[in-house]
Amino acid sequence: MIKSILTPTRNRPNNCERFIRSVYNATTSKQNVEMLFYVDNDDPAIDAYKSLELHSRKEFEDFKNIKFIFGEPQSVSISWNDLAEKCIGDVLIMGNDDLVYQTSSWDELLDVELKQFEKDEIYVAYMEDGINGERHCAFPIVS
Protein backbone atom coordinates (compact mmCIF):
# COMPACT_ATOMS: atom_id res chain seq x y z
CA MET A 1 0.00 0.00 0.00
CA ILE A 2 1.50 3.33 -1.11
CA LYS A 3 1.24 6.13 1.44
CA SER A 4 1.38 9.71 0.16
CA ILE A 5 2.24 12.36 2.74
CA LEU A 6 0.90 15.69 1.48
CA THR A 7 2.48 18.77 3.02
CA PRO A 8 1.92 22.44 2.30
CA THR A 9 4.88 24.47 3.56
CA ARG A 10 5.85 28.12 3.67
CA ASN A 11 9.14 29.79 4.59
CA ARG A 12 10.33 26.88 6.71
CA PRO A 13 12.68 24.73 4.62
CA ASN A 14 14.67 23.70 7.71
CA ASN A 15 11.52 22.38 9.38
CA CYS A 16 10.64 20.66 6.14
CA GLU A 17 14.00 18.91 5.99
CA ARG A 18 13.65 17.81 9.63
CA PHE A 19 10.19 16.43 8.81
CA ILE A 20 11.46 14.48 5.79
CA ARG A 21 14.35 13.04 7.81
CA SER A 22 12.04 12.02 10.67
CA VAL A 23 9.67 10.22 8.30
CA TYR A 24 12.60 8.52 6.59
CA ASN A 25 14.17 7.35 9.85
CA ALA A 26 10.87 6.01 11.23
CA THR A 27 9.73 4.23 8.05
CA THR A 28 10.32 0.53 7.47
CA SER A 29 9.08 0.15 3.87
CA LYS A 30 10.47 3.33 2.37
CA GLN A 31 9.63 2.22 -1.16
CA ASN A 32 5.94 2.56 -0.22
CA VAL A 33 6.11 6.19 0.93
CA GLU A 34 5.74 9.26 -1.25
CA MET A 35 6.25 12.78 0.09
CA LEU A 36 4.77 15.73 -1.80
CA PHE A 37 5.14 19.37 -0.78
CA TYR A 38 3.31 22.47 -1.98
CA VAL A 39 5.29 25.73 -1.92
CA ASP A 40 3.83 29.09 -2.94
CA ASN A 41 5.79 30.57 -5.83
CA ASP A 42 6.19 33.82 -3.88
CA ASP A 43 7.75 32.09 -0.88
CA PRO A 44 10.84 34.02 0.31
CA ALA A 45 12.65 30.69 0.79
CA ILE A 46 11.80 29.28 -2.66
CA ASP A 47 15.47 28.81 -3.61
CA ALA A 48 16.10 26.87 -0.40
CA TYR A 49 13.10 24.64 -1.18
CA LYS A 50 14.40 23.96 -4.70
CA SER A 51 17.78 23.04 -3.24
CA LEU A 52 16.11 20.85 -0.61
CA GLU A 53 14.18 19.00 -3.31
CA LEU A 54 17.37 18.14 -5.21
CA HIS A 55 19.17 17.14 -2.02
CA SER A 56 16.23 15.06 -0.76
CA ARG A 57 15.84 13.11 -3.99
CA LYS A 58 19.43 11.91 -3.58
CA GLU A 59 19.63 11.44 0.18
CA PHE A 60 16.22 9.80 0.52
CA GLU A 61 16.17 7.92 -2.78
CA ASP A 62 14.64 4.87 -1.09
CA PHE A 63 11.32 6.72 -0.93
CA LYS A 64 8.84 5.96 -3.69
CA ASN A 65 8.84 9.65 -4.59
CA ILE A 66 9.78 13.01 -3.15
CA LYS A 67 8.55 16.09 -4.99
CA PHE A 68 8.02 19.79 -4.39
CA ILE A 69 5.27 21.48 -6.36
CA PHE A 70 5.52 25.24 -6.79
CA GLY A 71 2.42 27.24 -7.58
CA GLU A 72 0.21 30.21 -6.89
CA PRO A 73 -0.23 31.23 -3.25
CA GLN A 74 -3.27 29.47 -1.81
CA SER A 75 -4.77 28.10 1.38
CA VAL A 76 -3.54 24.96 3.10
CA SER A 77 -6.73 23.07 2.24
CA ILE A 78 -6.53 23.93 -1.46
CA SER A 79 -2.83 22.98 -1.42
CA TRP A 80 -3.74 19.59 0.08
CA ASN A 81 -6.33 19.10 -2.68
CA ASP A 82 -3.79 19.96 -5.39
CA LEU A 83 -1.26 17.56 -3.88
CA ALA A 84 -3.92 14.85 -3.65
CA GLU A 85 -4.57 15.19 -7.39
CA LYS A 86 -0.87 14.66 -8.13
CA CYS A 87 -0.08 11.85 -5.70
CA ILE A 88 0.04 8.13 -6.44
CA GLY A 89 -0.87 6.87 -2.97
CA ASP A 90 -3.56 4.44 -1.93
CA VAL A 91 -3.63 6.26 1.40
CA LEU A 92 -3.33 10.04 1.74
CA ILE A 93 -1.79 11.49 4.89
CA MET A 94 -2.07 15.21 5.56
CA GLY A 95 1.30 16.50 6.69
CA ASN A 96 2.77 19.65 8.17
CA ASP A 97 6.32 20.94 8.08
CA ASP A 98 6.51 21.16 11.87
CA LEU A 99 5.70 17.48 12.43
CA VAL A 100 8.30 14.97 13.57
CA TYR A 101 7.54 11.27 13.17
CA GLN A 102 8.85 9.38 16.20
CA THR A 103 7.10 6.02 16.04
CA SER A 104 9.36 3.38 14.51
CA SER A 105 7.69 1.34 11.76
CA TRP A 106 4.69 3.70 11.75
CA ASP A 107 4.01 2.61 8.18
CA GLU A 108 3.67 -1.07 9.09
CA LEU A 109 1.57 -0.22 12.16
CA LEU A 110 -0.70 1.84 9.91
CA ASP A 111 -1.05 -1.06 7.46
CA VAL A 112 -2.21 -3.31 10.30
CA GLU A 113 -4.66 -0.70 11.61
CA LEU A 114 -6.14 0.03 8.19
CA LYS A 115 -6.84 -3.63 7.43
CA GLN A 116 -10.13 -3.23 9.28
CA PHE A 117 -11.33 -0.95 6.46
CA GLU A 118 -10.46 -3.27 3.56
CA LYS A 119 -14.07 -4.05 2.70
CA ASP A 120 -15.35 -0.49 2.95
CA GLU A 121 -12.32 1.31 1.48
CA ILE A 122 -13.74 4.66 2.64
CA TYR A 123 -12.38 5.94 5.92
CA VAL A 124 -10.67 8.68 7.83
CA ALA A 125 -8.09 7.81 10.47
CA TYR A 126 -5.46 9.74 12.36
CA MET A 127 -2.38 9.31 14.50
CA GLU A 128 -2.18 10.48 18.09
CA ASP A 129 -0.50 13.87 17.82
CA GLY A 130 0.30 14.19 21.52
CA ILE A 131 -1.80 17.34 21.75
CA ASN A 132 -5.41 16.73 20.74
CA GLY A 133 -5.88 13.08 21.66
CA GLU A 134 -9.24 11.80 20.46
CA ARG A 135 -10.81 15.28 20.47
CA HIS A 136 -9.50 16.35 17.09
CA CYS A 137 -8.23 14.69 13.93
CA ALA A 138 -5.36 17.13 13.35
CA PHE A 139 -3.71 15.38 10.40
CA PRO A 140 -6.19 13.02 8.76
CA ILE A 141 -5.36 9.85 6.90
CA VAL A 142 -7.92 9.18 4.17
CA SER A 143 -8.61 6.52 1.60
Task: State the predicted function of each range.
Residues N11, F68-V76, G130-I131:
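Short, acidic/glycine-rich phosphate-metal binding loop used to engage nucleotide
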Residues I2-S4, E34:
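Cell-envelope/extracellular polymer assembly enzymes that use nucleotide-activated donors
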Residues S104-V124:
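Conserved donor-nucleotide/metal-binding helix-loop-beta segment in metal-dependent transferases, i.e.
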Residues V23-I69:
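Acidic donor-binding segment of Leloir-type glycosyltransferases
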